Structures are given as C-alpha cells and as structure tokens.
A protein has these predicted regions:
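N-terminal, positively charged/glycine-rich alpha-helical extensions of SAM-dependent methyltransferases
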Residues: 1-28
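Conserved SAM-binding loop and adjacent beta-strand
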Residues: 30-46
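Class I SAM-dependent methyltransferase SAM/SAH-binding core
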Residues: 59-111
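A short SAM/SAH-binding and catalytic strip from SAM-dependent methyltransferases
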Residues: 119-133
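A short glycine-rich, Lys/Arg-flanked "PGG" loop and its adjoining helix->strand segment in the class I
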Residues: 135-146
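Conserved beta-strand signature within the Rossmann-like core of class I S-adenosyl-L-methionine
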Residues: 147-156
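Short "lid" loop at the C-terminus of a central beta-strand within the Rossmann-like core
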Residues: 155-160, 185-187
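Class I S-adenosyl-L-methionine
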Residues: 176-212
C-alpha cells in the first residue's frame, strides 16, 4: 500500500478518495506529517484567533486529529470547542485527546446539522488544493452568531484559482461579513525542505473576519 502523504492529499479528487486517504493516514498523521514537516499552520490560526479576541463556543472546521484545538487550549482558551470533519478516522484520533465538547461527522459544503450557536469559527488546512472550496462559506455562516469571529487558513496556491478572493469580496458586498483582514504565514517550518521540497515554502492567508 502506498503511504499517504502531502502530495496525495493535495491531489484528492472526490469524497471517496478523501475518506480513504484520511482513513489510512489517521494513525500516523501527527508524526509522519505534523511533526516531521513542522506543520505550524494550526498554531498560526490559533494565535490569530486569540489575538483578535476570539471566544467560544468555537466550531473547528476540518478538525482532523485536533491540532488546532490543541493549540487553542495551549494558548489558554477554556471555552467549548466542537470539531467537525468528513473523516471518521481522523475524528477518532481527535476524540482520544479530549479537547472537544463534541465531534461532528459532516460534509462542510452541505447544510450542517447544527444550530446558529458559535461565537468563533476556526479552520486550519481545510481550504487548500484537493480539499474544500469557498462553497463551504454559506453553511459555516449559517451556524455563526452575529459578530462571530472567523479565523480560517486558506492556502495561497488556491486563493485566486479556486475563487476564495472573489467569494469573500462578494460576502463583504452583501454585508454578510465585515472587518476582513489577512495575515500571511508559512505553512511549514524549516524541516519540511528535506522531506517535501515541493511544498516546503507553501504560504497561507489567515483570513480573519466577523459575521454580520
């Protein structure tokens, strides 16, 4: 069996392929990817959320194994965090860390089985190649309270190509979001160059805004 890796993840095409890759990767994701590649993006998102005054309850989109929630806890957030992911294998790993109030198995591009209850929406690594596009903004906004703070990482490789810039501009124009600002960050640390030089220099926008 081919070992799941970043290249395979960024080339995903369709829900079946996504479920298979993350089912196979879940057990080793934290070590073979997050640690070895110095995957700093979850910490960047958590830091931006906290610095902007983010509070809970928080919905962590694409929660994975809980890396972003762990960073939020490490930075002092004690409010409830709920985690949502398409992969049950990844959610099982997250559950074992006892970081979340509840975990939800759902497709973020569809209407979510949740009420409008969140003061914060976070996401790290979900809005990238082969994953989720701006079509997820509407379902996420539907569960955010007025004034809720969003802190979402969006890989720069897909920012314009996949229409994230246009989608956010449209949401601003429709007065559905406000106070949009971008923070540029490196996705990985220096160790990534020896493991995956093709992606070691990847950059992302931490996209901060509030629901109207």
């Amino acid at each position: 069996m081919t070992q799941p890796d970043l290249t395979a993840a960024l080339a995903l095409n369709g829900p079946d392929a996504t479920l298979k890759l993350y089912r196979d990767w879940a057990a080793t994701y934290d070590t073979t990817f997050a640690t070895d590649m110095q995957y700093n993006l979850p910490a960047h998102v958590a830091r931006a959320f906290r610095a902007a005054g983010g509070i809970g309850p928080v919905l962590d989109i694409g929660a994975g194994t809980g890396l972003l929630a762990q960073s939020l806890r490490d930075m002092g957030l004690t409010d409830p965090i709920d985690g949502l992911d398409f992969s049950t294998g990844m959610l099982e790993r997250a559950a074992a860390k006892y970081l979340y109030r509840t975990l939800i198995h759902a497709d973020v591009t569809q209407t979510l089985p949740l009420s409008r209850q969140y003061n914060g929406i976070t996401s790290s690594g979900t809005f990238t190649s082969g994953h989720v596009g701006p079509e997820a903004f509407a379902p996420i906004l539907a569960v955010a309270l007025p004034g809720a703070l969003f802190a979402l990482s969006i890989n720069q490789r897909v920012w314009t190509e996949n229409g994230f810039d246009a989608a956010l501009a449209s949401l601003q124009h429709e007065n559905r979001i406000h106070d949009l600002r971008l923070i540029e960050v490196a996705v990985y640390g220096t160790a990534a160059a020896a493991i995956d030089p093709g992606h070691a220099d990847d950059r992302a926008w931490i996209t901060l805004f509030r629901a109207t």
